[in-house]
């Protein structure tokens, strides 16, 4: 398949093919079997542990078993040949991420959970040999966990150029000061590494080259975990934490990439991670739709099954159509990420899928809750938790408005490059009087 640039977009010579490869089919079969035999039976126990605010101890045993089965690091196309696990392309991994999404903790079993997956992707891309040995190797092995500290409570973090946490260079040392929050994963007892985005003390006027990413040991002097922040009253065992950095000193060798490259590194981290998030979200929507269909078939009201009520049929049909639309959009982005020459509109694609998936989840789950009635509000089904998570997703990893802005800017940029392209489609009086000529 050949890919050529055309008017700011990408012209596909040949075709996009989203059919699952035989390799993806085989690994999906193995994953589904593992989920059914080993993970789903522990789901109630996991929720019991989560309700107590602690990680479930048995997850470590499941992780060891998954690694033995090769169901490990599946989300990393660039996985080194000597690293544990199985490398899959973004497109091949997408259906596996969807299957994992049905349980909030399944991705963790396979070492494919955020933020570790994105952090490993970033370290594979930009870490020095020493950083790879100290941080990447144990992350790939699953012996440590990590977190990514970007958002801040004192600025509008939806614009990352606002970030105020500061890093300065003192000889061969980096000194970090600032406050971060919603640092996912930082409360996990095995979290050893914080990737911290901070503004350079010597930053110039170029806002997009004013920040750097520093690798900070979680137990470094001056790092204070202030609290694990509940998200809509739910306290995640792994944490969405507020952290204060006071005169935290690390060797200059813990700078990731180049000085001032933090913004570009953070952007590069987002693409694969959003495909993973969105496919897991689609898996959750499939779960919600499946539960709603079962409920509609077995529940009766006003003398007939809910499945025969016209409005319920509309809800189910709308959900099926919207899920399939969203899946195709995400698969296109996964395919684009796999191309040797990424399409010119890849950034807009990534923004679009994040927006679509988060909104989709709220709509599909809301309909399912309506089918279930009071039970849909209870903890007896996963629906209330899924709805809550869908609402959080519309802010986490960038609010809807930022993604809409990205898509609109790309569209307007292309329109500006093609001014006048659509003028002949007007039917003004002058055009109506014009005499068309074939020759």
Walk through the language-model features, giving the residues of each.
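N-terminal amphipathic/basic-hydrophobic helices that include classical n-h-c signal peptides
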Residues: 1-15
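Long, acidic (Asp/Glu-rich), low-complexity accessory segments flanking structured domains
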Residues: 247-264
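A short, Trp-centered hydrophobic/proline-enriched beta-strand micro-motif
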Residues: 142-151, 196
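A short core secondary-structure module
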Residues: 173, 177-225
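Short glycine/proline-enriched turns and hinge-like loops at secondary-structure junctions
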Residues: 87-88, 158-161, 186-191, 206-210, ...
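N-terminal glycine-rich flavin-associated loop
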Residues: 108-130, 159
């Amino acid at each position: 398949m050949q890919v050529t640039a055309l008017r700011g977009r990408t012209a596909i010579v040949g075709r996009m093919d989203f059919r699952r490869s035989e390799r993806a089919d085989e690994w999906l079969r193995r994953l589904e079997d593992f989920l059914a035999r080993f993970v789903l039976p522990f789901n109630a126990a996991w929720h019991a542990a989560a309700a107590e605010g602690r990680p479930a101890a048995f997850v470590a045993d499941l992780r060891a078993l998954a690694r033995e089965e090769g169901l490990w690091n599946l989300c990393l196309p660039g996985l080194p040949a000597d690293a544990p696990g199985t490398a899959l392309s973004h497109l091949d991994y997408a259906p596996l991420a969807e299957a994992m999404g049905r349980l909030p903790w399944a991705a963790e079993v396979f070492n494919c959970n955020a933020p570790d997956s994105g952090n490993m992707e970033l370290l594979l891309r930009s870490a020095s040999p020493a950083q790879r040995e100290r941080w990447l190797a144990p992350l790939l092995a699953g012996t440590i966990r990590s977190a990514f500290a970007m958002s801040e409570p004192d600025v509008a973090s939806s614009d990352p150029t606002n970030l105020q946490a500061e890093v300065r260079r003192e000889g061969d040392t980096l000194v970090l000061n600032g406050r971060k929050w919603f640092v996912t994963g930082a409360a996990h007892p095995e979290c050893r590494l914080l990737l911290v985005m901070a503004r350079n003390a010597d930053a110039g006027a170029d806002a997009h080259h004013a920040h750097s990413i520093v690798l900070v040991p979680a137990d470094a002097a001056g790092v204070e975990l202030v609290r694990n922040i509940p998200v809509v009253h739910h306290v995640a065992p792994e944490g969405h934490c507020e952290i204060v950095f006071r005169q935290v000193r690390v060797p200059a060798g813990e700078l990731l990439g180049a000085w001032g490259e933090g913004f570009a590194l953070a952007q590069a981290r987002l693409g694969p991670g959003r495909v993973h998030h969105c496919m897991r979200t689609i898996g959750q929507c499939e779960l919600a739709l499946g539960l709603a269909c079962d409920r509609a078939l077995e529940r009766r009201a006003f003398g007939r099954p809910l499945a025969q009520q016209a409005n319920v049929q509309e809800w189910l049909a709308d959900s099926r159509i919207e899920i399939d639309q969203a899946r195709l959009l995400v698969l296109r982005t996964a395919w684009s990420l796999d191309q040797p020459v990424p399409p010119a509109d890849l950034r807009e694609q990534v923004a679009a899928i994040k927006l679509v998936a988060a909104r989709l989840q709220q709509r599909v789950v809301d309909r399912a809750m309506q089918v279930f009635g009071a039970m849909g509000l209870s903890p007896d089904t996963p629906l209330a938790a899924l709805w809550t998570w869908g609402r959080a997703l519309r802010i986490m990893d960038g609010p809807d408005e930022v993604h809409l802005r990205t898509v609109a800017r790309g569209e307007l940029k292309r329109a500006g490059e093609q001014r006048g392209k659509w003028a002949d489609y007007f039917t003004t009086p002058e055009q109506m009087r014009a005499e068309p000529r074939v020759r």
